[in-house]
């Protein structure tokens, strides 16, 4: 831990099209090798495809998808007397969002569709409907925490 001043958190400006900070973070997470305009093209293209396929507002579908993927609990390894326990801990609000976005992108990249726009749109629509690989990841994380509830008293 630093003994000097605490580092100020950088403020991420909302994205230009939807004026939303979560979308801006999502674009930044999609971005590879500093190519922000490409990342914006992928995200906005996926949003257009979502609006076309579902007939709903793309931003609402995105928000619902992120909400459905956010984990409430996770496990952290804690070493106690020679053995390591998986201790369930509650996830902070900012980390919940970060994990949801990270999982969405990870499982969208692993899908079988041809373009990233189609993959991302498919994963977002699946997540909004409470199905898909990212939702399964959240369920697995919660299941792990539930299975290790006996070690909750090791929390720090």
Curated annotation (Swiss-Prot):
Quaternary structure annotation from Swiss-Prot or TrEMBL: Part of the 30S ribosomal subunit. Contacts proteins S9 and S11.
Species in which this protein is naturally found: Syntrophotalea carbinolica (strain DSM 2380 / NBRC 103641 / GraBd1) (Pelobacter carbinolicus)
Keywords on record: Ribonucleoprotein, Ribosomal protein, RNA-binding, rRNA-binding, tRNA-binding
Protein name as catalogued: Small ribosomal subunit protein uS7
Entry-linked InterPro entries: Ribosomal_uS7, Ribosomal_uS7_bac/org-type, Ribosomal_uS7_CS, Ribosomal_uS7_dom, Ribosomal_uS7_dom_sf
CDD domains: uS7_Bacteria
Listed GO biological process terms: translation
Pfam families for the chain: Ribosomal_S7 (PF00177)
SUPFAM superfamilies to which the protein is assigned, alphabetical: Ribosomal protein S7
GO molecular function terms noted in the UniProt entry: rRNA binding; structural constituent of ribosome; tRNA binding
Cellular component aspect of the GO annotation: small ribosomal subunit
Function text: One of the primary rRNA binding proteins, it binds directly to 16S rRNA where it nucleates assembly of the head domain of the 30S subunit. Is located at the subunit interface close to the decoding center, probably blocks exit of the E-site tRNA.
Family named by the database record: Belongs to the universal ribosomal protein uS7 family.
HAMAP family tied to this protein: Ribosomal_uS7_B
Intrachain S-S bonds: none
Domain of life assignment: Bacteria
